[in-house]
């Protein structure tokens, strides 16, 4: 990939700088001892998202609001990283993705499945990302944050690369925005990895990620969705009868064309209800829906894009729409059952599986029976109440606060995953087995801080054998002198890199082994 080398050097120049006055010469180990006391007025926090749809930015906004309530944070800045890149890159990431969703959803599903295993991303893709994000790297460098929180995998990878090259000293937290864990999000090094549910955490642990680095937070949503509200007052604001169940039909921010089909079916319903149709940014869709409900306007309220979705969710009885990570989490936080339509292959299909499994949603596999599904639920108030209770049970309205507070509890240093350990995790994921069931030489060992028990690095047992580690070893001494002796041996280069990361400026250190 000779053609890419100049651009890789460009990225390296963007992150290269002399150590700042607050960066101890000893590297991350020495730095950790003083963190987070470098800024006497509080921490500098950077929240990075990507505007591929609205969800990643909404999660980032929820975290930003939660951080604003905490006394330890001096400054918090939120950046949509796509806004720092060139127009072609933005269109590829955003417009290109939604074009595939509309015209070739099977490609989206294939892409999701192909990157479902961790550490599988092609070098060419990494090079392309680096080429187009040099401006972002400079912004991160200039802001010099203590804490970086990422709600998209792209900035997480870039920040991890800066940490690995010792060009940034900060705590990195990665926050997933769907109910399942996708391996594309896993990077190294990082401090905290936040997932939406227990099964996702269990899956990550089975692949060898230390459990102390995985936190089940839920997906951050705007605060207050679970709060009690004056239903009558909100209903009056929208011209709704509080005595009737309200069906909230969402086209999403982009205005999904499927909405018109749903409205036509619901219009023929004989159940007593009112419907609020949110058409997003599509003015044409709003006009089409207005025309479709002509003559029955007392049952329908047609809106364009609105910032009042939270209030509408609080007073509604049923939500009809796509199972995006954020919209689904908002519904669950509000105790609002869902009728799921048109899930995008990959993450939205998995979100739908989870919601149906938990009894908080039903899924429409036929576009012709959406009205039938809605009628069935409206005719069975007991079932609707049970679904609402299930939604509240799995909802996590305080996920933003959970992430903010936990991210500030900085561990001693980021977790390092060696290249051989990455290969083992990838292999286990592709074979569909826990990493513990791999052959003995590829099994993973976690190096820990003997004083705190915190995980510091993951390596294969075979890698550690030159340091005298056996399958029954409970600790390992790692002297810099031994690493120097191994550096000319190609088979041990990965161990040398891992050891140098762990030692920082120390000559020798003893680590626990699990």
PLM region descriptions:
Residues 1-33:
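Compositionally biased, low-complexity flexible segments
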Residues 5-8, 38, 481, 491-492:
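Intrinsically disordered, low-complexity polyampholyte segments enriched for Lys and acidic residues
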Residues 8, 32, 36-279, 283-444:
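Nucleotide-activated sugar donor-binding and catalytic core shared by glycosyltransferases
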Residues 24, 431, 477-479:
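Low-complexity, intrinsically disordered segments with a bias for serine/threonine
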Residues 25, 31, 448-450, 462, ...:
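Serine/threonine-rich, low-complexity intrinsically disordered segments
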Residues 445-449, 455-459:
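Short linear proline/tyrosine/threonine-rich motifs used for host-factor recruitment
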Residues 454, 465-514:
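Membrane-proximal basic amphipathic "stem/tether" segments
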């Amino acid at each position: 990939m000779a053609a890419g080398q100049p651009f890789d050097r460009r990225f390296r120049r963007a992150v290269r700088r002399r150590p700042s006055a607050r960066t101890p010469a000893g590297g991350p180990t020495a730095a950790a001892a003083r963190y987070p006391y470098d800024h006497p007025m509080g921490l500098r926090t950077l929240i990075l998202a990507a505007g591929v749809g609205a969800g990643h930015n909404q999660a980032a906004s929820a975290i930003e609001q939660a951080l604003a309530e905490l006394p330890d944070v001096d400054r918090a800045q939120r950046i949509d990283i796509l806004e720092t890149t060139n127009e072609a890159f933005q269109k590829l990431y955003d417009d290109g993705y939604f074009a595939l969703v509309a015209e070739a959803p099977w490609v989206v599903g294939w892409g999701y499945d192909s990157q479902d295993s961790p550490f599988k991303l092609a070098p060419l893709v990494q090079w392309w990302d680096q080429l187009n994000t040099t401006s972002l790297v400079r912004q991160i460098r200039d802001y010099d944050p203590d804490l970086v929180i990422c709600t998209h995998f792209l900035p997480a990878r870039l920040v991890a690369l800066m940490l690995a090259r010792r060009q940034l000293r900060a705590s990195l937290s990665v926050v997933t925005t769907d109910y399942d864990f996708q391996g594309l999000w896993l990077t190294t090094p990082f401090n905290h990895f936040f997932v939406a549910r227990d099964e996702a955490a269990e899956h990550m642990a089975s692949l060898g990620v230390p459990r102390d680095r995985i936190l089940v937070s839920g997906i951050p949503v705007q605060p207050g969705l679970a709060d009690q509200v004056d239903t009558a007052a909100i209903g009056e604001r929208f011209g709704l009868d509080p005595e009737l169940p309200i069906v909230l039909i969402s086209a999403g921010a982009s205005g999904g064309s499927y909405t018109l089909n749903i409205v036509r079916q619901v219009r023929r319903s004989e159940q007593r209800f009112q419907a609020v149709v949110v058409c997003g940014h599509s003015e044409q869709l709003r006009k089409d829906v207005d025309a479709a409900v002509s003559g029955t306007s007392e049952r329908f309220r047609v809106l364009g894009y609105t910032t009042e979705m939270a209030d509408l969710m609080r007073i509604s009885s049923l939500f009809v729409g796509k199972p995006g990570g954020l919209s689904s989490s908002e519904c669950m936080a509000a105790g609002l059952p869902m009728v799921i339509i048109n899930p995008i292959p990959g993450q939205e299909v998995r979100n739908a599986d989870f919601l149906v499994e938990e009894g908080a949603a039903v899924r429409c596999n036929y576009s012709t029976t959406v009205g039938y599904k809605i009628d069935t639920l409206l005719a069975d108030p007991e079932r609707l109440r049970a679904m609402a209770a299930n939604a509240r049970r799995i909802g996590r309205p305080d996920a933003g606060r959970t992430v903010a507070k936990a991210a500030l509890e900085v561990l001693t240093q980021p977790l390092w995953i060696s290249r051989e350990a990455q290969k083992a995790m990838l292999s286990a994921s592709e074979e569909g087995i826990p990493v513990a069931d791999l052959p003995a030489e590829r099994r993973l060992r976690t190096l820990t801080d003997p004083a705190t028990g915190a995980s510091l690095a993951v390596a294969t047992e075979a890698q550690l054998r030159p340091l005298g580690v056996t399958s029954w070893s409970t600790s390992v001494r790692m002297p810099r002198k031994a690493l120097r002796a191994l550096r000319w041996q190609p088979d041990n280069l990965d161990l040398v890199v891992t050891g140098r990361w762990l030692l920082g400026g120390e000559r020798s250190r003893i680590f626990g082994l699990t």
